[in-house]
Regions:
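Conserved, mostly hydrophobic/aromatic
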Residues: 39, 60, 118, 204, ...
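Alpha/beta catalytic cores of nucleotide-metabolism and tRNA/nucleoside-modifying enzymes
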Residues: 1-9, 251-268, 273-322
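Hydrophobic faces of well-ordered beta-strands that scaffold small-molecule active sites
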Residues: 37-40, 67-69, 88-92, 116, ...
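N-terminal capping/small domains of soluble enzymes
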Residues: 1-123
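Glycine-rich beta-to-alpha transition loops that act as phosphate-gripper elements at the mouths
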Residues: 71-74, 95, 195, 214-220, ...
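Structural motif
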Residues: 63, 83, 111, 207, ...
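An N-cap/entry alpha-helix motif that binds or orients negatively charged groups
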Residues: 1-30, 139-196
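Alpha-helix-loop-beta-strand connector modules within alpha/beta enzyme cores
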Residues: 78-89, 144-150, 194-212, 244-268, ...
């Protein structure tokens, strides 16, 4: 649905402008990035390609775009932070246990992450029927089907042998018992504070020393109130995976931009696959676009080289359109 909305947005070109030099550099939170897009937070990325978090972090640092590490990543805050050059973003699924929350924030800050992204749009676990039908599980179930899939994907299998079976590396240290991976998944899920409120945001605001972005907003009233608590809002419907009947962020973007004015930063994701999509988001009022699936699809196809190629294609498309 997100992509259908994007496909129905058209930009009318204007010509006779003389020589045009496209400048993609974008300033956000007093840092200048080389493009107006970054890598969105995606949980358990290493299920798709072993070592994915580290590959994406290294790429983002090399090409000077932000990479957002998820709370439910397969690599630790510290290990990924080493490759981000003090310009990483950390996405927080707010834990119920405030001691864990405070420790996560300290670890992220001490590891050089400069922007905190707080996810607000998971008050309940959604029914993801496609995942159920596909048999997706964490950890992966070992059966004839997965053995066959591993056999026909030798590079993925070799990567698993090198990096090990994906784990909740960021949350593992808080697991008191030495349970198996299934129990660790249950523990990580049990710690997610599904009912986020403004008081919780205020508490985080008093702890975190850098910019804070609130992710998952879709309503004008929430966006207006958020101005008093955070430094930017991040319009998202979780890539269409959380609530099927919610609108696309692109549909609500123009009105929210009108209500917030021109100066308050708006970030957007969900359905953005190409440079054309990025330009559409910018023209409708976003300051920055976050992209997820294209990078992990490219990783699954060609590993780190694939992610780098995806970045090149998206950036080249933006320059071409401009």
């Amino acid at each position: 649905y997100n992509q259908e909305i994007l496909k129905n947005v058209f930009l009318t070109p204007r010509y006779l402008k003389g020589t045009v030099e496209a400048d993609l550099k974008t300033k956000l939170f007093d840092r200048v990035y080389d493009a107006p897009f970054g890598i969105a937070p995606i949980g358990m990325t290493s299920l798709i390609w072993p070592g994915a978090e580290l590959s994406l972090a290294k790429l983002a640092s090399e090409v000077n775009i932000p990479y957002t590490l998820s709370t439910v990543a397969c690599a630790s805050i510290e290990n990924v932070g080493k490759h981000l050059g003090n310009k990483g973003w950390f996405q927080l699924y707010p834990p119920k246990d405030k001691n864990i929350r405070d420790d996560l924030l300290k670890r992220a800050y001490d590891s050089g992450y400069e922007v905190l992204v707080i996810t607000s749009d998971i008050p309940a676990s959604s029914r993801r029927e496609r995942l159920r039908k596909a048999g997706v599980s964490v950890p992966p179930k070992i059966n004839l089907r997965t053995i066959f899939q591993a056999a026909i994907s030798p590079m993925w299998s070799l990567g698993i042998l090198k990096h090990g079976m994906p784990q909740f590396a960021t949350m593992d240290k808080y697991q008191k018992s030495q349970g198996n991976e299934k129990s660790k998944k249950g523990y990580a899920g049990s710690q997610m504070n599904r009912y986020l409120d403004w008081n919780y945001l205020e508490e985080v605001r008093n702890i975190w020393k850098g910019p804070i972005v609130l992710k998952g907003l879709m309503d004008n009233r929430d966006a207006l109130k958020a101005k008093d608590y955070v430094d930017a809002i991040y319009l998202s419907n979780h890539g269409g995976r959380q609530l099927d009947i919610a609108p696309s962020p692109l549909q609500v973007l123009p009105n929210i931009r009108k209500d917030l004015g021109d100066e308050f930063p708006i970030i957007i994701d969900s359905g953005f696959y190409s440079g054309q999509d990025v330009v559409k988001g910018l023209m409708l009022g976003a300051d920055f676009v976050m992209i997820g699936r294209p990078f992990v699809i490219a990783l699954a196809a060609l590993g780190a080289r694939g992610a780098a190629h995806a970045h090149y294609i998206i950036k080249d498309e933006i320059e071409n359109i401009m």
